[in-house]
A protein has these predicted regions:
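Catalytic active-site module of serine/aspartate enzymes centered on a nucleophile-bearing elbow/loop
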Residues: 138-177
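Alpha/beta-hydrolase-fold enzymes
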Residues: 1-75
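Short beta-strand/loop motif that positions the catalytic acidic residue
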Residues: 96, 102-104, 110
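Short, conserved loop/helix-junction motifs that constitute active-site signature segments
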Residues: 93-97, 136-138
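Conserved beta-strand scaffold positions in the cores of enzyme catalytic domains, especially
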Residues: 6, 102, 143-145
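Active-site nucleophile elbow and catalytic-triad environment of alpha/beta-hydrolase enzymes
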Residues: 71-93
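Conserved loop-alpha-helix segment in the C-terminal half of the alpha/beta-hydrolase fold
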Residues: 106-145
């Protein structure tokens, strides 16, 4: 069957790094990845993401911590290169041939110590980047911000999840009717 719509809610359209890291660091690391693809590098993701989710820490979800570790594993340079190359295409602007809903939190934070921001904002991606590059896409694109949403919107608190699903199903009903 053909794809008739798409829902994007973990839009990794850019690395959430400083301007210097974006201009020099990521391209340099990506270039190294061309020649040393298996070399591993720290992910640089916020350490509070898994604790914000897991029941044994601050979250409400029970999942296997061997599969989603408390501390992020290192990533291969080939992974960084692949993401960076794909992001360059997104940055130019892409055409999506099916109706697309891009949903994201209303704010980004980067807590250095535990606080509730980890459960009420995106601590992995910069939502301004998501919006910026989603607006460069052409086709039938709709953007939707979710107040107090986490990075993974469907793992947010129950009231936020209800809003996510309400918006998603309203959009699907409208697009599919």
């Amino acid at each position: 069957t053909a794809l008739t719509a798409t829902f994007i809610f973990l839009a990794f359209y850019d690395f959430n790094k400083t301007a210097f890291e974006q201009k020099f660091g990521i391209p340099c690391i990506s270039q190294f990845g061309k020649y040393t693809p298996d070399l591993e590098f720290p992910s640089g993701l916020n350490r509070w993401y898994t604790p914000s989710l897991h029941l044994s820490m601050y979250g409400e979800w029970n999942f296997n911590l061997e599969w989603k570790k408390e501390k992020f594993p290192k990533v291969r340079l080939s992974f960084i290169r692949a993401i960076y190359e794909a992001q360059k295409e997104i940055h130019k602007g892409v055409y999506l041939s099916v109706p697309t809903l891009v949903m994201y939190s209303n704010r980004t934070t980067n807590p250095k110590q535990w606080n509730s921001d980890a459960q009420h904002s995106d601590i992995i991606l910069n939502v301004k980047d998501i919006e910026k590059y989603a607006l460069k896409m052409s086709g039938n694109i709709q953007l939707c911000t979710i107040k107090n949403g986490m990075h993974d919107l469907v793992l947010s608190s129950a009231p936020v999840r209800e809003k996510v699903y309400s918006e998603l199903f309203q959009w699907l009903n409208f697009k599919m009717s």
